[in-house]
């Protein structure tokens, strides 16, 4: 029997083995026709810069659930994409001396861009949408017009505070020490003609949704949304901008572009064919079974998103789960702050499989987790090198000693096989 190497070099092994699995359709399962389709839609990252380890963790956790559901026999739609409009992208492009479209193209499709990162981390998404895609832009214009025609969007003047990094509007009373309550950064004064969505109209229905159903999880997120946003009084939401141009144009009022969060949220439906002819599986995969979202965007997905769907008379997603942050030195990883960990460097050093295992094994999903190289190394040594490595070493040694280094075909199953299969099916 060939002697195992003393040191594991992931670059020499993982890509070759993973490609072999792909070539043999090892990750494809035959859907059970008796099971309803299952859909998981990932919040599209805003493409203001290269993604970091926090994004890789977000995608990996959702990919793992997707693969598990496929193994259970579900016909799964795993949707990912990118949020490519907004003022901060326009500003970043200007500073880089390129057009906004060139800027986002490079972040998405360029070397070590988002598509490369998804490939690196073995993300098995079924579809990828860019909010600059023509079919999505046209669908958003139709959606905006319909909410306007329904009487839920009206023109006025916005005057208040705006956090450019978060693309969020705030009132003076919502600020924390005069700064954005989500990211803690400076806000700027904003005053411009704008369209507003009647968010206040749906306050009671949204509160009932949060308090009386299991729509939003965990329960701590429900208390936060109700006590911090709904009970103080929901104000109507500014849903268009006139101070910049990089966005979906409001087709019936030149000069206005659709607020980036309206644009981004509806990608979950347009990517399935809603209000467009690009795809035709909206009825099959909507409503989504689950949204996994970072806690900083729970407000958008549990208050604003349901209200707009109610306005459109569309089904609501079944569940929204607000997960914690991946922290570095006690603070949230942020592209704009520059406190990020490069997933490319980590994967080259430790391997993608070990990295995916570490992310799933180490951090409680609903809570924040503080990343460090020491924690990653200890987890790999303890669980993989020591526990799994020792098990493999002893198994190979016994196989060599007692069976001449060969594994013979086993006829039939034993009770322990049936018991194990039952346990897996009950997960």
Predicted regions and their residues:
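A broadly conserved sequence feature marking short terminus-proximal activation segments
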Residues: 103-162
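Bulky hydrophobic/aromatic "packing anchor" residues in well-ordered structure
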Residues: 83, 111-114, 206
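Acidic, turn-prone loop/beta-hairpin segments
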Residues: 83, 403-427
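Structured secondary-structure scaffolds
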Residues: 1-80, 135-139, 183, 189-401, ...
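A glycine-rich phosphate-binding loop feature that marks nucleotide/adenosyl-phosphate handling sites
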Residues: 85, 160-166, 324-326, 375, ...
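Short, charge-patterned binding micro-sites
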Residues: 82-88
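Cys/His-rich short segments
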Residues: 150-207
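A charged helix-plus-loop insertion that forms the helical arch/lid used to bind
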Residues: 92-108
């Amino acid at each position: 029997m060939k002697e195992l190497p003393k040191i594991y070099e992931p670059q020499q092994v993982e890509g070759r083995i993973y490609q072999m699995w792909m070539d043999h359709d090892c990750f494809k399962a035959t859907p059970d026709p008796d099971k309803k389709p299952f859909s998981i839609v990932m919040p599209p990252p805003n493409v203001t810069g290269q993604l970091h380890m926090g994004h890789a963790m977000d995608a990996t956790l959702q990919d793992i659930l997707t693969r598990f559901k496929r193994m259970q026999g579900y016909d799964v739609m795993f949707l990912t994409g990118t949020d490519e409009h907004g003022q901060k992208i326009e500003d970043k492009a200007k500073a880089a001396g390129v057009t906004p479209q060139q800027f986002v193209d490079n972040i998405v499709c360029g070397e070590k861009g988002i598509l490369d990162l998804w490939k690196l981390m073995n993300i098995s998404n079924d579809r990828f949408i860019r909010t600059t895609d023509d079919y999505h832009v046209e669908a958003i214009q139709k959606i905006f017009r319909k909410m306007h025609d329904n009487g839920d969007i009206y023109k006025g003047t916005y005057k208040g505070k705006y956090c450019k990094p978060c693309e969020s509007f705030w009132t003076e009373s919502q600020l924390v020490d005069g700064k954005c309550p989500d990211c803690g950064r400076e806000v700027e004064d904003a005053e411009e003609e704008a369209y507003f969505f009647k968010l206040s109209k749906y306050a009671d229905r949204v509160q009932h949704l949060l308090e009386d159903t299991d729509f939003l999880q965990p329960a701590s997120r429900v208390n936060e949304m109700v006590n911090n946003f709904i009970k103080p009084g929901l104000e109507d939401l500014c849903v268009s901008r006139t101070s910049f141009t990089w966005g979906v144009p409001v087709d019936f009022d030149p000069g206005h572009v659709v607020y980036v969060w309206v644009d981004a949220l509806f990608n979950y439906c347009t990517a399935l064919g809603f209000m467009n002819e690009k795809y035709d599986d909206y009825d099959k995969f909507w409503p989504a079974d689950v949204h996994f979202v970072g806690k900083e965007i729970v407000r958008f997905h549990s208050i604003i998103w349901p209200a707009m769907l109610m306005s459109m008379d569309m089904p609501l997603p079944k569940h929204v789960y607000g997960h914690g942050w991946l922290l570095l030195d006690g603070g949230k990883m942020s592209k704009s702050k520059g406190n990020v960990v490069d997933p490319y460097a980590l994967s080259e050093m430790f391997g993608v499989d070990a990295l995916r295992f570490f992310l799933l094994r180490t951090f409680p999903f609903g809570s924040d987790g503080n990343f460090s190289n020491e924690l990653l190394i200890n987890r790999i040594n303890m669980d993989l090198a020591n526990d799994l490595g020792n098990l493999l070493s002893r198994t190979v040694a016994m196989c060599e000693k007692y069976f001449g280094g060969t594994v013979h075909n086993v006829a039939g199953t034993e009770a322990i096989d049936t018991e194990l299969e039952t346990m897996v099916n009950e997960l």
